[in-house]
Amino acid sequence: MLAAEGGHNPIIPEPVEIVVGLVAFLLLLFVLWKYAVPRFEKVYEERSKRIEGGIEKAEAAQAEAQRTLEQYRSQLAEARAEAARIRDDARAEGQQIVEEMRAQAQAESERIVSAGQSALAAQRAQIVAELRADLGRQAVDLAGRVVGESLEDEARRRGTVDRFLDELEAASAPASKA
């Protein structure tokens, strides 16, 4: 059957169809180029500006965040330095308090030792005086018994006893130093 029609090929379009299709394509191309492409360009440009603005805003926000971070870091460093200074001051103050307490304890110790030595010296002097008086009375009583008479003359007796005790003390002092 195809052979009977004679030379018409269904794959190849008719020349009129090619011309109409070409005119319609050119008309569509003109309409798109005149109206649609400028709108697409405008939308594309607005979108590019928004993206660039967003990038600039993001960069500005990042720079602000970096400045804030640096501020926080410097404040943190200042706070650490302040804490270290306070710690050092507290240590120094504690050391000073310890030194003051030591000095007070040393002074109190020296005062107590001095008071004890003074009390001992006073007691020793009192005991020596009491022993001298007692020794003097006993010596007079013994001398009175040996002699057989009473040696009641107080002034003479005291002078003799005191002189004897002084000589005895003087004799024992070099012996105790040696």
From Swiss-Prot:
Keyword Transport (UniProt): yes
Top-level taxon of origin: Bacteria
Keywords, ordered alphabetically: ATP synthesis, Cell membrane, CF(0), Hydrogen ion transport, Ion transport, Membrane, Transmembrane, Transmembrane helix, Transport
CDD domains reported in the protein's UniProt record: ATP-synt_Fo_b
Transmembrane segments: 11-31
Gene Ontology terms: cellular component: plasma membrane; proton-transporting ATP synthase complex
Molecular function via GO: proton-transporting ATP synthase activity, rotational mechanism; proton-transporting ATPase activity, rotational mechanism
Gene3D superfamilies: F1F0 ATP synthase subunit B, membrane domain
SUPFAM superfamilies per UniProt: F1F0 ATP synthase subunit B, membrane domain
Topology of the protein relative to the lipid bilayer: Single-pass membrane protein
Pfam families in alphabetical order: ATP-synt_B
Entries under PANTHER family matching the protein: ATP SYNTHASE SUBUNIT B, ATP SYNTHASE SUBUNIT B', CHLOROPLASTIC
NCBIfam families from the UniProt entry: ATP_synt_b (TIGR01144), PRK05759.1-3 (NF004412)
Subunit organization: F-type ATPases have 2 components, F(1) - the catalytic core - and F(0) - the membrane proton channel. F(1) has five subunits: alpha(3), beta(3), gamma(1), delta(1), epsilon(1). F(0) has three main subunits: a(1), b(2) and c(10-14). The alpha and beta chains form an alternating ring which encloses part of the gamma chain. F(1) is attached to F(0) by a central stalk formed by the gamma and epsilon chains, while a peripheral stalk is formed by the delta and b chains.
Similarity comment: family membership: Belongs to the ATPase B chain family.
Function of the protein: F(1)F(0) ATP synthase produces ATP from ADP in the presence of a proton or sodium gradient. F-type ATPases consist of two structural domains, F(1) containing the extramembraneous catalytic core and F(0) containing the membrane proton channel, linked together by a central stalk and a peripheral stalk. During catalysis, ATP synthesis in the catalytic domain of F(1) is coupled via a rotary mechanism of the central stalk subunits to proton translocation. Component of the F(0) channel, it forms part of the peripheral stalk, linking F(1) to F(0).
Protein's name in the database: ATP synthase subunit b
Naturally occurring in which organism (per UniProt): Saccharopolyspora erythraea (strain ATCC 11635 / DSM 40517 / JCM 4748 / NBRC 13426 / NCIMB 8594 / NRRL 2338)
Encoding gene (name): atpF
